[in-house]
């Protein structure tokens, strides 16, 4: 267990934002389904990206790692090279690859760690039942064994659990011999993630018609082509630095595509609504020290931003209400419960509701001991508000940032952050 003690300091300077995990997962999978070699550059080898690489190797894909790059020799005819696909704690890896594995008609078992073991997969179980695909699971939890062949046709999928199920099907269905349609039976949340998927499919030569978000039309017998791509910066990660810059002395965030399809790009507009001074320039965003005010924030399309927005709201003038956040309960932790618990430990006033948070802002927080709940976004959100603490902030389980942002603490230091690190036990 790693601990980090942060001495309250206002950060300033420039930081290069790590590449988007969401975009990289999709590029990796599309490249793996082509019949040629694709080169992917600007890759950050977070635990989740490593999980997808290892899982694809289990399906016969050849992947060579370079210095922040990947060379992928695709295999348009995937096969079960290893019958066990371990997804570590990556929900994207698991949910994206299950449908692809189901196109093979061979027995394969998916395993995982931590909260991933419990994250819901009912959307796929319903499909398996309707198509008579054999599956075995432990009361709905991992490990999951499947044996059968996915068929083209009409699919009915809930849109309010996770858009990852839609993405998983969109990767697999173009490979089948017949045409398919995915009908979304509830409001589709996190639409932007599906936009990223369809955009990436298009770059690799695969066409999907889904402009209405109510149904997606997928032609069968499509072929993925090899493509070289550079991974853009991650807006879910820039959120932490924008908040720290607003609470500090100003930060310039580099390596961003300000025309990105990433839904978390809305962080810029949310922060402006709260009073943050932000300027978007070509490939970068500058944030200046700002006084912030509470607002109502609908996070149905940007759930990953909730922890850091809650942290900022806790030191903003007035009251902030974060609504439509029920899905936060089935992430790496119950994020509504986790961020409420930890912010309140250090003097915040956060009220947890079933699907929302009400936050009454304070001038400062007191600091003290908090835990990450083994959740990377909780750890980074707490660090983001450390400059408003009157005493050092000690975060237990700080190593969890490796899941998405291995260089987070190094970047924190580079901007003037004062931290001490130590480990206890293994």
Curated annotation (Swiss-Prot):
Active-site positions on this chain: 304
Pathway field: Metabolic intermediate biosynthesis; chorismate biosynthesis; chorismate from D-erythrose 4-phosphate and phosphoenolpyruvate: step 6/7
Swiss-Prot/TrEMBL keywords: Amino-acid biosynthesis, Aromatic amino acid biosynthesis, Cytoplasm, Transferase
Gene Ontology biological process: amino acid biosynthetic process; aromatic amino acid family biosynthetic process; chorismate biosynthetic process
Domain of life: Bacteria
GO molecular function, one term: 3-phosphoshikimate 1-carboxyvinyltransferase activity
Subunit structure: Monomer.
Protein name: 3-phosphoshikimate 1-carboxyvinyltransferase
Native source organism of the sequence: Clostridium kluyveri (strain ATCC 8527 / DSM 555 / NBRC 12016 / NCIMB 10680 / K1)
Lineage of producing organism: Bacteria, Bacillati, Bacillota, Clostridia, Eubacteriales
């Amino acid at each position: 267990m790693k601990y980090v003690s942060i001495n309250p300091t206002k950060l300033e300077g420039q930081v290069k934002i790590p590449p988007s995990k969401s975009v990289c997962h999709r590029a990796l999978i599309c490249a793996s389904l082509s019949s040629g070699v694709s080169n992917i550059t600007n890759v950050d080898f977070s635990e989740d990206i490593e999980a997808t690489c290892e899982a694809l190797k289990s399906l016969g894909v050849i992947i060579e790692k370079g210095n922040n790059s990947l060379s992928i020799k695709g295999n348009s005819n995937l096969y079960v090279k290893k019958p066990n696909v371990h997804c570590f704690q990556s929900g994207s890896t698991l949910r994206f690859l299950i449908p692809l594995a189901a196109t093979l008609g061979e027995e394969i078992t998916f395993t995982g760690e931590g909260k991933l073991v419990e994250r819901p997969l009912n959307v796929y179980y319903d499909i398996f039942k309707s198509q008579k695909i054999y599956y075995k699971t432990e009361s709905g939890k991992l490990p999951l064994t499947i044996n059968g062949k996915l068929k083209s046709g009409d699919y009915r999928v809930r849109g309010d659990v996770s858009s990852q199920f839609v993405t998983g099907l969109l990767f697999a269905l173009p490979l089948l011999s017949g045409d398919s349609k995915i009908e979304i039976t509830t409001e589709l949340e996190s639409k932007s993630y599906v936009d990223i998927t369809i955009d990436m499919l298009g770059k690799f030569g695969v066409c999907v018609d889904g402009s209405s978000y109510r149904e997606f039309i997928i032609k069968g017998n499509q072929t993925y082509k090899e493509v070289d791509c550079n991974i853009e910066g991650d807006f879910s990660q820039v959120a932490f630095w924008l908040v720290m810059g607003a609470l500090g002395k100003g930060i310039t965030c580099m390596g961003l595509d300000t025309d990105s399809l990433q839904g978390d790009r809305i962080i810029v507009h949310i922060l402006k609504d709260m009073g943050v001074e932000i300027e978007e320039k070509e490939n970068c965003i500058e944030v200046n020290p700002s006084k912030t005010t509470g607002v109502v924030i609908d996070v149905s399309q940007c759930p990953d931003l909730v922890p850091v927005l809650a942290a900022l709201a806790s030191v903003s003038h007035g009251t902030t209400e974060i609504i439509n956040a029920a899905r936060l309960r089935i992430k790496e932790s119950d994020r509504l419960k986790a961020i409420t618990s930890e912010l309140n430990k250090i003097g915040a006033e956060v009220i947890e509701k079933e699907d929302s948070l009400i936050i009454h802002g304070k001038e400062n927080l007191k600091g003290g001991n908090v835990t990450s709940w083994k959740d990377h976004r909780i750890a980074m959100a707490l660090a983001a508000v450390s400059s408003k603490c009157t005493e050092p902030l000690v975060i237990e389980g700080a190593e969890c940032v490796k899941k998405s942002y291995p260089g987070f603490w190094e970047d924190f230091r580079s901007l003037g952050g004062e931290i001490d690190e130590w480990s206890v036990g293994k």
